[in-house]
Protein backbone atom coordinates (compact mmCIF):
# COMPACT_ATOMS: atom_id res chain seq x y z
CA UNK A 1 0.00 0.00 0.00
CA UNK A 2 1.13 3.54 -0.71
CA UNK A 3 0.18 6.56 1.38
CA UNK A 4 2.50 9.43 0.43
CA UNK A 5 1.71 13.14 0.33
CA UNK A 6 3.88 15.95 -1.00
CA UNK A 7 2.50 19.49 -0.70
CA UNK A 8 3.80 22.96 -1.47
CA UNK A 9 1.84 25.87 -0.09
CA UNK A 10 1.72 28.80 2.29
CA UNK A 11 0.81 28.76 5.97
CA UNK A 12 -2.56 30.37 6.63
CA UNK A 13 -1.51 31.28 10.19
CA UNK A 14 1.37 30.63 12.58
CA UNK A 15 1.74 26.94 13.56
CA UNK A 16 -0.03 26.05 16.82
CA UNK A 17 2.58 24.28 19.00
CA UNK A 18 1.36 22.23 21.97
CA UNK A 19 2.73 19.45 24.16
CA UNK A 20 1.07 16.15 25.02
CA UNK A 21 0.82 14.89 28.61
CA UNK A 22 3.91 12.77 27.94
CA UNK A 23 5.86 15.83 26.76
CA UNK A 24 5.83 15.23 22.99
CA UNK A 25 5.64 18.38 20.87
CA UNK A 26 2.85 18.55 18.29
CA UNK A 27 2.14 21.43 15.92
CA UNK A 28 -0.98 21.86 13.83
CA UNK A 29 -1.19 24.14 10.82
CA UNK A 30 -3.09 24.68 7.60
CA UNK A 31 -1.47 24.96 4.17
CA UNK A 32 -3.09 26.91 1.35
CA UNK A 33 -2.16 24.99 -1.80
CA UNK A 34 -2.95 26.57 -5.16
CA UNK A 35 -4.72 24.44 -7.72
CA UNK A 36 -3.06 23.90 -11.10
CA UNK A 37 -5.96 25.46 -13.01
CA UNK A 38 -7.98 28.65 -12.91
CA UNK A 39 -11.71 29.08 -12.36
CA UNK A 40 -14.13 30.79 -14.78
CA UNK A 41 -13.00 34.22 -13.57
CA UNK A 42 -9.35 33.40 -14.27
CA UNK A 43 -8.46 33.22 -10.57
CA UNK A 44 -6.41 30.40 -9.13
CA UNK A 45 -8.30 28.80 -6.24
CA UNK A 46 -6.62 27.15 -3.27
CA UNK A 47 -7.24 24.08 -1.15
CA UNK A 48 -6.78 24.51 2.60
CA UNK A 49 -5.21 21.34 3.96
CA UNK A 50 -4.99 20.59 7.69
CA UNK A 51 -1.63 19.20 8.77
CA UNK A 52 0.01 17.96 11.95
CA UNK A 53 3.71 17.47 12.72
CA UNK A 54 5.27 15.84 15.80
CA UNK A 55 8.34 16.04 18.05
CA UNK A 56 11.47 18.02 17.10
CA UNK A 57 10.26 18.98 13.60
CA UNK A 58 7.16 20.50 15.25
CA UNK A 59 9.33 22.68 17.48
CA UNK A 60 11.53 23.67 14.55
CA UNK A 61 8.53 24.63 12.45
CA UNK A 62 7.06 26.70 15.29
CA UNK A 63 10.39 28.55 15.63
CA UNK A 64 10.98 29.35 11.95
CA UNK A 65 7.67 29.28 10.04
CA UNK A 66 5.13 32.09 10.19
CA UNK A 67 1.87 32.98 8.48
CA UNK A 68 2.49 33.21 4.73
CA UNK A 69 5.70 31.14 4.79
CA UNK A 70 6.17 29.00 1.69
CA UNK A 71 6.60 25.38 2.82
CA UNK A 72 7.12 22.00 1.25
CA UNK A 73 5.89 19.08 3.35
CA UNK A 74 6.17 15.32 3.00
CA UNK A 75 3.89 13.00 4.92
CA UNK A 76 0.87 10.73 4.80
CA UNK A 77 -2.93 11.07 4.94
CA UNK A 78 -4.54 10.06 8.21
CA UNK A 79 -8.22 9.78 9.08
CA UNK A 80 -9.28 9.71 12.72
CA UNK A 81 -12.54 10.16 14.57
CA UNK A 82 -13.75 11.20 17.98
CA UNK A 83 -16.99 11.92 19.76
CA UNK A 84 -17.65 15.61 20.41
CA UNK A 85 -19.44 17.13 23.44
CA UNK A 86 -22.82 16.72 21.75
CA UNK A 87 -22.22 12.98 21.37
CA UNK A 88 -21.73 13.17 17.60
CA UNK A 89 -19.02 11.22 15.80
CA UNK A 90 -16.60 13.67 14.10
CA UNK A 91 -14.23 12.48 11.36
CA UNK A 92 -10.99 14.34 10.71
CA UNK A 93 -8.73 13.87 7.68
CA UNK A 94 -5.30 15.48 7.91
CA UNK A 95 -1.75 15.16 6.63
CA UNK A 96 0.71 13.81 9.19
CA UNK A 97 3.96 15.49 8.17
CA UNK A 98 7.18 13.57 8.52
CA UNK A 99 9.39 16.33 7.17
CA UNK A 100 9.14 19.90 5.93
CA UNK A 101 11.30 22.38 4.07
CA UNK A 102 11.23 26.17 4.13
CA UNK A 103 11.15 27.15 0.46
CA UNK A 104 12.05 30.82 0.76
CA UNK A 105 14.45 32.85 2.83
CA UNK A 106 13.31 34.82 5.84
CA UNK A 107 14.19 38.05 4.05
CA UNK A 108 11.94 37.07 1.11
CA UNK A 109 9.11 36.39 3.57
CA UNK A 110 9.62 39.74 5.26
CA UNK A 111 9.75 41.60 1.92
CA UNK A 112 6.46 39.98 0.93
CA UNK A 113 4.95 41.12 4.23
CA UNK A 114 2.98 39.17 6.78
CA UNK A 115 1.20 37.12 4.15
CA UNK A 116 -2.13 38.85 4.60
CA UNK A 117 -4.77 38.89 1.92
CA UNK A 118 -6.66 36.26 0.04
CA UNK A 119 -5.03 32.95 -0.73
CA UNK A 120 -7.21 32.72 -3.85
CA UNK A 121 -5.23 35.59 -5.36
CA UNK A 122 -2.55 34.29 -7.71
CA UNK A 123 0.01 36.75 -6.35
CA UNK A 124 -0.03 35.10 -2.91
CA UNK A 125 0.41 31.53 -4.09
CA UNK A 126 3.46 29.50 -4.93
CA UNK A 127 2.59 29.56 -8.63
CA UNK A 128 3.76 33.17 -8.86
CA UNK A 129 7.06 32.21 -7.26
CA UNK A 130 7.85 29.25 -9.47
CA UNK A 131 5.45 28.79 -12.35
CA UNK A 132 7.09 25.54 -13.45
CA UNK A 133 6.39 23.60 -10.23
CA UNK A 134 3.80 20.93 -10.83
CA UNK A 135 3.33 22.04 -14.42
CA UNK A 136 3.51 19.14 -16.85
CA UNK A 137 3.99 21.42 -19.83
CA UNK A 138 7.17 20.44 -21.66
CA UNK A 139 8.05 24.09 -22.28
CA UNK A 140 8.47 24.82 -18.58
CA UNK A 141 11.05 23.99 -15.98
CA UNK A 142 14.41 22.63 -17.07
CA UNK A 143 13.32 22.05 -20.66
CA UNK A 144 12.80 25.74 -21.29
CA UNK A 145 13.22 26.66 -24.98
CA UNK A 146 14.93 23.35 -25.70
CA UNK A 147 18.33 24.90 -25.04
CA UNK A 148 21.16 22.48 -24.66
CA UNK A 149 24.57 22.97 -23.11
CA UNK A 150 27.24 23.67 -25.68
CA UNK A 151 30.72 23.80 -24.13
CA UNK A 152 32.17 25.47 -27.22
CA UNK A 153 29.85 28.45 -26.94
CA UNK A 154 31.03 31.34 -24.81
CA UNK A 155 27.58 32.12 -23.45
CA UNK A 156 24.41 30.11 -23.07
CA UNK A 157 21.37 31.79 -24.57
CA UNK A 158 18.30 31.33 -22.45
CA UNK A 159 15.12 33.16 -21.64
CA UNK A 160 14.38 31.55 -18.30
CA UNK A 161 15.44 34.50 -16.17
CA UNK A 162 18.67 32.86 -15.02
CA UNK A 163 21.94 34.79 -15.38
CA UNK A 164 24.13 33.86 -18.33
CA UNK A 165 27.67 32.93 -17.31
CA UNK A 166 30.33 32.12 -19.81
CA UNK A 167 32.56 29.11 -19.22
CA UNK A 168 35.43 31.24 -17.84
CA UNK A 169 33.46 33.30 -15.35
CA UNK A 170 33.26 32.27 -11.71
CA UNK A 171 29.82 33.09 -10.30
CA UNK A 172 31.13 32.48 -6.77
CA UNK A 173 34.23 34.60 -7.21
CA UNK A 174 34.10 38.03 -5.76
CA UNK A 175 36.07 40.82 -4.28
CA UNK A 176 37.52 38.53 -1.63
CA UNK A 177 35.49 40.17 1.11
CA UNK A 178 33.67 38.10 3.69
CA UNK A 179 29.97 37.34 3.44
CA UNK A 180 27.74 38.98 6.03
CA UNK A 181 25.03 36.47 7.03
CA UNK A 182 22.58 37.16 9.83
CA UNK A 183 21.57 34.35 12.20
CA UNK A 184 17.97 35.04 11.14
CA UNK A 185 18.83 33.93 7.59
CA UNK A 186 19.97 30.47 8.72
CA UNK A 187 17.34 27.70 8.88
CA UNK A 188 18.97 25.96 11.86
UniProtKB/Swiss-Prot annotation:
GO terms (BP aspect): DNA recombination; DNA repair; DNA replication
Entry keyword set: DNA damage, DNA recombination, DNA repair, DNA replication, DNA-binding
Keyword Lyase listed: no
MF terms in GO: single-stranded DNA binding
Motif (Important for interaction with partner proteins): 183-188
Biased composition range(s): Polar residues: 119-129
GO cellular component: nucleoid
Biased composition (Low complexity): 130-163
Domain SSB: 1-104
Chain intervals for the UniProt region annotation (Disordered): 106-188
Keyword presence, DNA repair: yes
UniProt xrefs under InterPro entries: NA-bd_OB-fold, Primosome_PriB/ssb, ssDNA-bd
General function of this protein: Plays an important role in DNA replication, recombination and repair. Binds to ssDNA and to an array of partner proteins to recruit them to their sites of action during DNA metabolism.
NCBIfam families xref list: ssb
Subunit structure as annotated in this protein's UniProt entry: Homotetramer.
Matches recorded under PANTHER family: SINGLE-STRANDED DNA-BINDING PROTEIN
Protein name according to UniProt: Single-stranded DNA-binding protein
Organism, scientific name: Enterococcus faecalis (strain ATCC 700802 / V583)
